[in-house]
Amino acid sequence: MFLGTFTPKLDDKGRLTLPAKFRDELAGGLMITKSQDHSLAIYPRDEFVKLARKAAAAPRNDPAARAYVRALAAGTDEQHADAQGRITLSADHRRYANLSKECVVTGSVDYLEIWDLAAWERYLGDNEEDYSQATGESLSEIV
């Protein structure tokens, strides 16, 4: 399970060191993809394969499903962390997430998110009240 918030630095080569506590779960490979709110998502390879297969099973005559599958496939990079636990983020991924040297890696239960630190802090400030009032239909089973 991926829990917690960490603030690794992005180096000049676009490498980011993953938190040590997550490296075993990602040892079988990982998939980096564009996510909501101009963040990046890191999935263990096996979990991503399940997600991608589910997405690919959607009706191909549905324009929204087609667009989602296209964006998911085109925006994903498969990697293995190096011996120091670093991954290299592509220029496209760094641009999409507006990443500076100051980054945040945050757990999202079954995947990780990568944010620019300033964007993460803005997001937290903008959404604090939403979290306090999390009673929407999609959350009714858990809150």
UniProtKB/Swiss-Prot annotation:
Major subcellular site: cytoplasm
Cited Gene3D superfamilies: Transcriptional regulator MraZ domain (3.40.1550.20)
Pfam family, one: MraZ
Record's keyword annotation contains Cytoplasm: yes
Gene Ontology molecular functions: DNA-binding transcription factor activity; transcription cis-regulatory region binding
Keywords assigned by UniProt, alphabetized: Cytoplasm, DNA-binding, Repeat, Transcription, Transcription regulation
GO BP terms, alphabetized: negative regulation of DNA-templated transcription initiation
InterPro entries: MraZ (IPR003444), MraZ_C (IPR035644), MraZ_dom (IPR020603), MraZ_N (IPR035642), MraZ_sf (IPR038619), SpoVT-AbrB_dom (IPR007159), SpoVT-AbrB_sf (IPR037914)
Residue span(s) of domain SpoVT-AbrB: 5-47, 76-119
Keyword Metal-binding: no
GO cellular component: cytoplasm; nucleoid
Record's subcellular location: Cytoplasm, Nucleoid
Family indicated by similarity: Belongs to the MraZ family.
Assembly: Forms oligomers.
Protein name from the UniProt record: Transcriptional regulator MraZ
Organism from which the protein derives: Rhodococcus erythropolis (strain PR4 / NBRC 100887)
Gene, per the UniProt record: mraZ
